[in-house]
Amino acid sequence: MAHRILRDHEADGWERSDFPIICESCLGDNPYVRMTKANYDKECKICTRPFTVFRWRPGRDARYKKTEICQTCCKLKNVCQVCLLDLEYGLPVQVRDTALNISTHDSIPKSDVNREYFAEEHDRKARAGLDYESSFGKMRPNDTILKLQRTTPYYKRNRAHVCSFFIRGECTRGAECPYRHEMPETGELSQQNIKDRYYGVNDPVAMKLLGKAGEMGTLESPDDESIKTLYVGGLNSRILEQDIRDQFYAHGEIESIRILADKACAFVTYTSREGAEKAAQELSNRLVINGQRLKLTWGRPKPDQDGANQQGGVAHSGLLPRAVISQQHNQPPPMQQYYMHPPPANQDKPYYPSMDPQRMGAVISTQEAGGSSTENNGASSSSYMMPPHQSYPPPPYGYMPSPYQQQYPPNHHHQPSPMQHYAPPPAAYPYPQQPGPGSRPAPSPTAVSAISPDSAPAGSGAPSGSSQQAPDVSTATGSSQ
């Protein structure tokens, strides 16, 4: 062609754009995305014309993604430039066309010349301001679309590819390898072709989804005619009571709507059984509120309130489990074991022996002791129970106990008067002290004991230590005799 030789980009139909047409799953969950743009970098895999390629990383653990087809082919099928799924429902082209009864297999030519001419005609209409876009979004979805459509992004699709060296056992990168160290999945889903996905022919993913839609059954009504309540599960904070009422009111008059926020569910009760059956038939497997797919089933009848209250009241009235107490509710209680204290009557909490404040080592107040403070002759209001200081039987196996002074601390209730002095026994000095050079010899114990305290002169110049030590020794000696 002459315009190909002139290299006129606009006349040749080469695409030049500023932003790609992609779905939310391919864009990723990161609000700050850095894209690189390369004009006329690759050729479209459908029409084989050069186009602008965008490349970015959807997330931290995702692989780099890039556009695969041009925007002209993307607008003809209303699909994403990367994954080639429908932009509105997130389904393959074959599933969407089958559900909406659209035959687009022969509308787009497949030969090189006819395909290029077809694309140039659509580009010419777009430059002229004519509406050439498809009417896929203008059609009303049917039951199959509502059952299979994706309401939330699927970011797992952006994971890295499987490492081929890891499959052969030759990967030396270890944890630093940017690819997944997993075994690949084999089967029909692993054999996919981008052209079959675009034209909607022999797509294994579409075959699986269509088979799943055929297996979905309707919601069967329960045999109990008194049940008029429907259970709605999978709620979130964005769904309000008015949203649920607007969705269910078209099928019958609603008696009440009860929302349990902590359990993310709601119960819709109709005034008649016919309204509940109609809502279950119309909304089964296709209940979507505010973009959130919800689960719809029949509600169960409430349990007996009297039996539940009686069982709950018996559950906390003793030490035995609930099952044993319920069995013994109409029977006399068995005899208590010898090592178990019988629980007091009419108690709300269990009783254990360790809860008795009269046990050894517990702090007993004046009121709990019951007049014990009067017997102690002005003792403190609370005291620790100490073991009595008395003789104990000898321990077995020839164990020699420690001296009495080391067993228990001295009793501080009776303090000695300041005038009383206790001298060490004579056994504390087994040997006489040797006089050193230039010191006076110490008097013998007999000489000290013979001297009377009254015979010592009042104004003598004896050292204070010797004059005070003699009366102490004599007192101790006299008391020992």
Curated annotation (Swiss-Prot):
Pfam families: RRM_1, STL11_N, Torus. The keyword Ligase does not apply. Residues 329-481 are annotated as: Disordered. Coiled coil: none annotated. SMART domains: RRM (SM00360), ZnF_C3H1 (SM00356). CDD domains: RRM_RBM22 (cd12224). Residues 369-389, 399-410, 449-471 have a biased composition (Low complexity). Keywords: DNA-binding, Metal-binding, RNA-binding, Zinc, Zinc-finger. GO terms for molecular function: DNA binding; mRNA binding; zinc ion binding. GO terms for cellular component: nucleus. This is Zinc finger CCCH domain-containing protein 4. It comes from Arabidopsis thaliana.
